[in-house]
Design a protein with these regions (language model features):
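Active-site-proximal or metal-binding-adjacent scaffold patches in catalytic folds
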Residues: 1-132, 142-213
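Walker B catalytic acidic pair
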Residues: 138
Length: 213
């Protein structure tokens, strides 16, 4: 048998296995939400409709955020352009029930996995505001050109948080005074101080012009 053919077959099989393991999990199923009548990929649990409804609200807020960003900045802000291009509702799903898995985004939005349950035996759904803080964190990764939690990322996260608060898509909380349990960990701080919210509401260009005087 031709060695090149064998290598080709092995490569194809490896790709199929990779796609199966990364895109499919028997613990996740598509469930129709009673809120938006759309299908959402969530864990197959007794409260799966509630989970689907939670994801319907997450996606609604995300769409509203992107829409308002575009309305406010048009095509004048590169960060907004990047987020609008990368964000897609259909790429969001619930995390599989693994002990060490929380939330993450893959390849800048190709897949956005969100943990929405407690890690104890109850597996209770998390409140929407706490989940949105985490979701906005992931959207900041989509907005950021570089990789990791660097200065660019944290500035973009503050920018997103400030506007989400302004547009009532997220309610500011003091996690230092009152930590919030989330997915087996605790959220103990926010990168955005309340006093700094106003300066992130204006455009990046306007902020830079202020610093020149």
């Amino acid at each position: 048998m031709n060695p090149e053919y064998i290598v080709f077959c092995v490569a194809i099989i490896t790709l199929i296995v990779y796609l199966y393991l990364t895109a499919y999990s028997p613990s996740l199923i598509y469930v129709r939400s009673t809120e938006d009548n759309k299908l959402h990929l969530v864990q197959n649990k007794p409260d799966k409709v509630d989970a689907a409804n939670l994801f319907a609200e997450i996606k609604r807020r995300n769409r509203e955020l992107v829409k308002k960003f575009v309305e406010k900045f048009g095509d004048k802000d590169g960060r907004v352009n990047t987020l609008a291009k990368r964000y897609k509702d259909e790429n969001i799903r619930e995390a599989v029930p693994k002990v060490n898995q929380t939330s993450y985004s893959l390849n800048k939005g190709e897949k956005i996995v969100i943990c929405v349950r407690s890690k104890d035996s109850k597996n209770e759904l998390t409140d929407i505001n706490t989940v949105m803080f985490v979701v906005l964190h992931e959207l900041a990764h989509l907005m950021t050109l570089s990789v990791g939690h660097n200065d660019e990322f944290w500035e973009n996260f503050r920018f997103i948080l400030a506007h989400a608060i302004e547009w009532k898509l997220y309610t500011v909380e003091n996690y230092e005074k009152k930590p919030k349990p989330y997915c087996g960990i605790k959220i103990t701080e926010s990168p955005l101080e309340t006093k700094d919210i106003p300066k992130y509401i204006v455009s990046k260009e306007t902020r830079e012009s202020f610093t020149q005087f």
